[in-house]
Amino acid sequence: MLEPQENGLTDLPDYEHIEDETFPPFPPPASPGREDGEGAEPEEESGRGAPVPVPPKRTVKRNIPKLNAERLISERGLPALRHVFEKAKFKGKGHEAEDLKTLIRHMEHWAHRLFPKLQFEDFIDRVECLGNKKEVQTCLKRIRLDLPILHEDFVSNNDEVEENNGHDVTATELDHFLTNSYGSVEFASESSRSLTEEEQQRIERNKQLALERRQAKLLSNSQSLGNDLSVNTPSTQTSEAGSTGEEQKEEESNGFNKDLLDSPHNAGAASTVNEEEQLKVEETQLDQSF
């Protein structure tokens, strides 16, 4: 302690003859010997010199819309052209220029809705190139044939079919017997027509066959008669002439009977005609024998 002197003043020590205190040197920066957090600042300062690798930013790539075949046959593509000109009014003859302007205006509106990035001229060129694709051609065929393309078309067609089926069911329930009777009448008329045509063909065919057989037999009989005339007596000639006449009658009757027997509707008439012909033949034979 410093002793107080007179007049309230203290005697200051003599610092000139006192040796300086020796302090240990400072440890290097960021060394484990330093307990305080002062080493963090030099680290940051030293790290500024070296380049630190920065992770790349993730960029989200957006799908750029393209005018391809799938987009052209979509809901706003070619199927929408069926309804583009529903409200369009054309003036007709004498106003061709105005009608063409309205047509192009509606087409431009359709093209802008489908793909607004392209101009109308470029859009037309692109659509012309896409017209060779198979998908586009099938879509155009379905439009021309009025076939369903979109899901809405399928749903509307199914609804119409169900409604029609409901009406058909009620109609068939009410008019079941009428339709059956009408169908049976039509079937009977068609079958009768076909039968009559077949019968006519059979009759003509049988007639031709009978005539051919008759001519062949007549020729053979005439030749045999010519040979027998030089040998046989006149009585035999008369008997042969009668036999040839009978054979001709029998051939004619047989041909006629065949024609009648071939037709199913004339079976009864054919049997009666056969009986009459047989009776006539028997009568002629009895007359010749007497």
From Swiss-Prot:
GO biological process, alphabetically ordered: cell cycle phase transition; cell division; DNA replication checkpoint signaling; mitotic intra-S DNA damage checkpoint signaling; positive regulation of cell population proliferation; replication fork arrest; replication fork processing
Location of Phosphoserine modifications: 194, 222
Pfam families for this protein: Swi3
Keyword DNA-binding: no
Keywords: Cell cycle, Cell division, Cytoplasm, DNA damage, Mitosis, Nucleus, Phosphoprotein
GO molecular function, one term: DNA binding
Assembly and oligomerization: Interacts with TIMELESS (via N-terminus), which impairs TIMELESS self-association. Associates with the MCM2-7 complex. Interacts with RPA2, PRDX2.
Family: Belongs to the CSM3 family.
Role summary: Plays an important role in the control of DNA replication and the maintenance of replication fork stability. Important for cell survival after DNA damage or replication stress. May be specifically required for the ATR-CHEK1 pathway in the replication checkpoint induced by hydroxyurea or ultraviolet light. Forms a complex with TIMELESS and this complex regulates DNA replication processes under both normal and stress conditions, stabilizes replication forks and influences both CHEK1 phosphorylation and the intra-S phase checkpoint in response to genotoxic stress.
Name of the protein described by the UniProt record: TIMELESS-interacting protein
Organism of origin: Bos taurus
